[in-house]
Swiss-Prot record:
Subcellular location per the Swiss-Prot or TrEMBL entry: Mitochondrion inner membrane
CDD domains: EF4_II, EF4_III, LepA, lepA_C
Similarity comment text for this entry: Belongs to the TRAFAC class translation factor GTPase superfamily. Classic translation factor GTPase family. LepA subfamily.
Keyword match Cell cycle: no
Key word Mitochondrion present: yes
GO biological process terms held by the UniProt record: positive regulation of translation; translation
Keywords: GTP-binding, Hydrolase, Membrane, Mitochondrion, Mitochondrion inner membrane, Nucleotide-binding, Protein biosynthesis
Name assigned to this protein: Translation factor GUF1, mitochondrial
Residues that hold GTP according to the record: 66-73, 130-134, 184-187
Organism: Candida albicans (strain WO-1) (Yeast)
Amino acid sequence: MLLRPNSGNTLKYGCLLTKRWLTTSKLLYSVEDMKIKIGQEQYRKALEERIDKIPIENYRNFSIVAHVDHGKSTLSDRLLEMTGVIKPGSKSQVLDKLDVERERGITVKAQTVSMFYNDGKQDYLLHLVDTPGHVDFRAEVSRSYASCGGALLLVDASQGVQAQTVANFYLAYSMGLKLIPIINKIDLDSANIPGAREQIETTFELDPNECIPVSAKTGLNVEQIIPSVIKNIPSPVCDVNKPLRALLVDSWHDPYVGVVMLVHIVDGRMKKGMKILSAHTNRTYDVKEVGIMYPDRTPTSFIKAGQVAYIIPGMKNPREALVGDTFYQMGKHEGLEPLPGFEEPKPMVFVGAFPADGKEFNAMDDQMQNLVLNDRSVTLEQKTSNALGLGWRLGFLGSLHASVFKERLEKEYGAKIILTAPTVPYKIIYKNGEEKIVTNPDDFPDNQKHHDVESYMEPYVEAIMTVPNEYVGNVMTLCLNNRGEQKEIEYLTTGQVLLKYEIPTSQLVEDFFGKLKGCTKGYASLDYEEAGYRKSDIVKMQLCVNGEPQDALTTVIHRSQAQARGKEYVTRFKKFLSYQLLKVPISLKIIQKVVARETIKAKRKDVTQRLHAADISRYKKLLERQKEGKKQMKLSGRVTIKNDAYQAFLRRED
């Protein structure tokens, strides 16, 4: 019979020699092998049989908590090889579906993969939920963690605990996940296993004896992980006999089938043809397909409580897929409560976006809309700039989110785009008690008294940084220069220092991480979380050319930085403007007061070059006419600024 599992798994010299999976004899097969051997339909039925026979008590849903480059994707690949989901060496970074994820080494969209495991006595169904680690995608992470019972806490043996490890640990711990510490990269010469154990004990208060030292690259000791997952991580709290309740973990748009949703089935069953109801939009959908990720979409006739699986709901508008939404079976939803965790995404970074060539607006608008369909956390609205023409105002979860969006737009559609400097949402408190959130610098008041403003508030973040001992002074100076306030400092083993600062979000989005890397020679790591609003002395800063404000370059800044920043702005922008026939002043205004100014001298045409030296009256007449012409030009003329100048300035080119 197809469902007989193999009894063992052998590792030799760190290389995987055999794999657990479905087998007809002692010879083992991977997913691809079995599809070819027995045919798609028989394979699907065998898969459903196996899932149906596994009790919920034998389900394990888990994630991997790790800092970037600590080996999360490699470890995932080894686990998939161990359980026969993929052939050894056949794929790498299976769970990173997007090109930008593979290139940057980060996870942007939540993914899952199902695995079968047999310990020689009984079958287990495992769901590995791969989540974004960066704070920009933290809302998606919390939904993904809600579908898990535990997580592997991955620490690099050579680098130790890093900022993102700490931030993600606290999020997982706060949600009650059981954590299993894994020390990775023990095959490196620089590996310090005792130091990593000590850090795990002192930083996370976890038992160092529970740490599993592994090498995800070679496969050494990886076979110890799944038995530990089964032993330590609890099965999901679900009931297959209750009415359907499914939590939406993530969604994406497929050009062939439309919206695909990743869901955690908390109660009941879902099958093809079922009519489901959204708890938050009250819309109904006919389920076109259900299945598991194994590792790609594998259709099944049903999915049941405890599973993390995909559905194709026949949804026409992808923006109706709200992460954290609850779905019921139509007609069996009376008295059911939505699952906790729904929250509308709140953009924290806003940019203006304009096509490099204004003629491309219509084509790029379609491309922009298509990309936004894949990421509901992006807000999009059209806007017009007197400097750059038609464009959009985009809202993102953070600066990394904005950078990833721009990169995907350029790589997937070949679009060339100009992004203005990032801004954050400021809060204005009026004297009558009203509050207003401003996300566009153009809408920020020019004069506090004139607009009856009581005070301004700006958002802050708590930044968590890990740096080597020798660079602590440099980092403290950087934080001080960016208006940071120190909250905590902790000296870790392995020569690392953990710093916590509260920093204005506006300073963070101005390439703070790049500066941090620069002052530590690339050895620092950073993570952060929102820390609320604080009262602040912030002002609107307008760059004017020939007296006309350039709205694409308007920004909001703290008053203490205005003078220096203003001088830098006008000096740098002057470099990108060509000479005109009249004198052009470039000024920086704050509350209608000029705080910095540069002037581009006028081109001078020698109108007297063909005159005879003795013709004085003619000489004076031509000069007078030229002078009068310049007066008229000054009254009616406008300075033409090419898009290249804005692009170079916003890219901070010299």
